[in-house]
């Protein structure tokens, strides 16, 4: 039967509950257990799909097309389980489900209330996400004390009663701040956070105490005494140089052993050799390169979280330190392309809206004319097509209908219909809702032989995740190909262009999908590894090597 680990956070937000949960899951997986993780978000949005990246960070897309919290990206990067829409739900989804049931009469005339109807729906979602696994780690978003989190905390309190101590475990993540004026670490915020949790009816079994410096044993004993937690279950989590070292650090403090003992799990010893190799590759690069990432959300690091991590993964698998130079696309519009000088490669990521679009197009032009390795992702492919159409194919005024509906040459246009993986047809128009109406999730793409794309992946058909509603306009296909653009990947039905490249360029590749969502530190991703190899070749003054696979 599935065992449940509930992870809450206190004192302040952004303590790293997702990293802590992912790291523990990685250790348990390394001990031979089948694990999954689920994120419960207290906001009323149905999903983060329409939320600003400045507020929420990136939207992570699962294989089955769910738009989710970026923590699911951490989950997939740390464990081999593929997450889906069952692994993420929000207050908005819970209330939507309950109201739908009430309208159908499923509550038989009862007064619908937070308890039991909302809490029962939360528990149903948790159990559904955990089916078939040895251990399910459930992360509760927000901070203990927030009014929004109360229904979720009440639901997991009830689950502890239902499951008992041998099938459920509470881990509470807190902050132990250092007060420089006093020269001391302060445990009082942790004590009050646990007190707040206990007033709800939850007694944590384990505390993970975040700090920017080592926490003395005396302070851990003090925390244990005032929070009613066993002393060996007070885990100090000190800031690490890389998140991929955290599984080993938590294992050294026997966090997994405490979990195995309390839940009476049948687990072997942990084999963390893969994580040791990852950290070793990060610590001992053979070369460094600088990649310019030209976007519109670069002042908020979480907006491109998976993309930044994918470049780190490529560095791991090519023994290269990848330094990312974040460049605001509006800066290029205002001050020119000087910020791109000296970089070894240029990447333009996905995005929405007209702001900064001409800066991205200018970055593509710089990469093409200066023969700098270029990788375009989603919107990065669209601006590559626009730039090529304007400046190589001579289509003056070429644009996307997303930004200029009256463009004389709409080389990028709204997808009005497409075939899903299940074989059905999806239809969209300009009047469709913004939320949940894009081409989402894993889609197959057929690669053209003898292209850079095919050499990079080393296979004929790939599956990558999508999140877009605009596409290459096939009416301009022949014109652009005649001018030298190469279409190197299409949807299986041949109707949607998925990858383009410029054969005359040392390394110029753009894709409509988001390869960063499937990159992992242990497995890498062939597209990013090929991109970083091309950056290394430029840095070393050599020709890019023949691409092929994620491994060095």
Curated annotation (Swiss-Prot):
List residues binding L-glutamine: 351, 379-382, 402, 469
Query: What does the entry list as the binding residues for ATP?
Result: 14-19, 71
Where along the chain is CTP bound? 13, 146-148, 186-191, 222
Residues that bind Mg(2+), according to the entry?
Answer: 71, 139
What Pfam families would the database entry show?
Answer: CTP_synth_N, GATase
Q: Which GO terms describe its molecular function?
A: ATP binding; CTP synthase activity; glutaminase activity; identical protein binding; metal ion binding
What does the UniProt keyword field contain? Answer: ATP-binding, Glutamine amidotransferase, Ligase, Magnesium, Metal-binding, Nucleotide-binding, Pyrimidine biosynthesis
Q: Where does UTP bind?
A: 13, 186-191, 222
Tagged with keyword Membrane: no
| Residue span of region Amidoligase domain | 1-265
Q: What is its EC number?
A: 6.3.4.2
Superkingdom in the source lineage = Bacteria
Activity: how regulated:
Allosterically activated by GTP, when glutamine is the substrate; GTP has no effect on the reaction when ammonia is the substrate. The allosteric effector GTP functions by stabilizing the protein conformation that binds the tetrahedral intermediate(s) formed during glutamine hydrolysis. Inhibited by the product CTP, via allosteric rather than competitive inhibition.
- Give the protein's biological function: Catalyzes the ATP-dependent amination of UTP to CTP with either L-glutamine or ammonia as the source of nitrogen. Regulates intracellular CTP levels through interactions with the four ribonucleotide triphosphates.
- Annotated family: Belongs to the CTP synthase family.
What else is on record for this protein?
A: CTPSs have evolved a hybrid strategy for distinguishing between UTP and CTP. The overlapping regions of the product feedback inhibitory and substrate sites recognize a common feature in both compounds, the triphosphate moiety. To differentiate isosteric substrate and product pyrimidine rings, an additional pocket far from the expected kinase/ligase catalytic site, specifically recognizes the cytosine and ribose portions of the product inhibitor.
Q: What is this protein called?
A: CTP synthase
Biological source species: Methylococcus capsulatus (strain ATCC 33009 / NCIMB 11132 / Bath)
């Amino acid at each position: 039967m599935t065992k449940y680990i509930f992870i809450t956070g206190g004192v302040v937000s952004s303590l790293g509950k997702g990293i802590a949960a992912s790291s523990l899951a990685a250790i348990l997986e390394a001990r031979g257990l089948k694990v999954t993780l689920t994120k419960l978000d207290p906001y009323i949005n149905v999903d983060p799909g329409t939320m600003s990246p400045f507020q929420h960070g990136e939207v992570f897309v699962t294989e089955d097309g769910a738009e989710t919290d970026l923590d699911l990206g951490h989950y997939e990067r740390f464990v081999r389980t593929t997450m889906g829409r069952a692994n993420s739900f929000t207050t908005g989804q819970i209330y939507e489900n309950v109201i739908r049931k009430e309208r159908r009469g499923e509550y038989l005339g009862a007064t619908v209330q937070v308890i039991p109807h909302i809490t029962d729906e939360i528990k149903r979602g948790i159990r559904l996400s955990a089916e078939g696994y040895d251990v399910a780690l459930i992360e509760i978003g927000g901070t203990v004390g927030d009014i929004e989190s109360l229904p979720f905390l009440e639901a997991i309190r009830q689950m502890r009663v239902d499951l008992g101590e041998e099938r459920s475990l509470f881990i509470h993540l807190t902050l132990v701040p250092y007060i420089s004026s006093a020269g001391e670490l302060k445990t009082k915020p942790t004590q009050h956070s646990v007190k707040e949790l206990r007033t709800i009816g939850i007694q944590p079994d384990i505390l993970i105490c975040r700090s920017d410096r080592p926490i003395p044993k005396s302070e851990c004993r003090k925390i244990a005494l005032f929070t009613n937690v066993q002393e060996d279950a007070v885990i100090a989590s000190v800031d690490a140089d890389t998140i991929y070292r955290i599984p080993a650090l938590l294992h050294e403090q026997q966090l997994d052993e405490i979990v195995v003992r309390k839940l009476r799990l049948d687990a072997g010893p942990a084999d963390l050799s893969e994580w040791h190799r990852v950290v070793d590759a990060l610590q001992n690069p053979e070369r460094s390169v600088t990649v310019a990432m030209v976007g519109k959300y670069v002042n908020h690091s979480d907006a491109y979280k998976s993309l930044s991590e994918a470049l780190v993964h490529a560095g791991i698998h090519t023994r290269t330190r990848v330094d990312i130079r974040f460049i605001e696309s509006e800066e290029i519009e205002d001050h020119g392309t000087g910020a791109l000088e000296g970089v070894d490669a240029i990447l333009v990521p996905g995005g929405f809206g007209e702001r900064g679009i001409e800066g991205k197009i200018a970055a593509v032009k710089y990469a093409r004319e200066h023969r700098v390795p270029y990788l375009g992702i989603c919107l990065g492919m669209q601006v590559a097509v626009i730039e090529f159409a304007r400046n190589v194919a001579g289509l003056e005024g070429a644009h996307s209908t997303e930004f200029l509906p009256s463009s004389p040459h709409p080389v990028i246009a709204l997808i009005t219909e497409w075939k899903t993986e299940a074989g059905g047809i999806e239809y969209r128009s300009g009047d469709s809702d913004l939320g949940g109406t894009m081409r989402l999730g894993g889609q197959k793409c057929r690669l053209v032989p003898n292209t850079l794309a095919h050499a990079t992946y080393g296979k004929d058909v790939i599956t990558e995740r999508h999140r877009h509603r605009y596409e290459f306009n096939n009416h301009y296909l022949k014109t652009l190909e005649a001018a030298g653009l190469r279409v190197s990947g299409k949807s299986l039905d041949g109707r949607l262009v998925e990858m383009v490249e410029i054969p005359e360029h040392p390394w110029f590749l753009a894709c409509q999908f988001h390869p960063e969502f499937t990159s992992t530190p242990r497995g890498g991703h062939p597209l990013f590894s090929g991109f970083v190899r091309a950056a290394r070749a430029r840095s070393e003054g050599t020709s890019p090597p023949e691409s092929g696979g994620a491994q060095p």
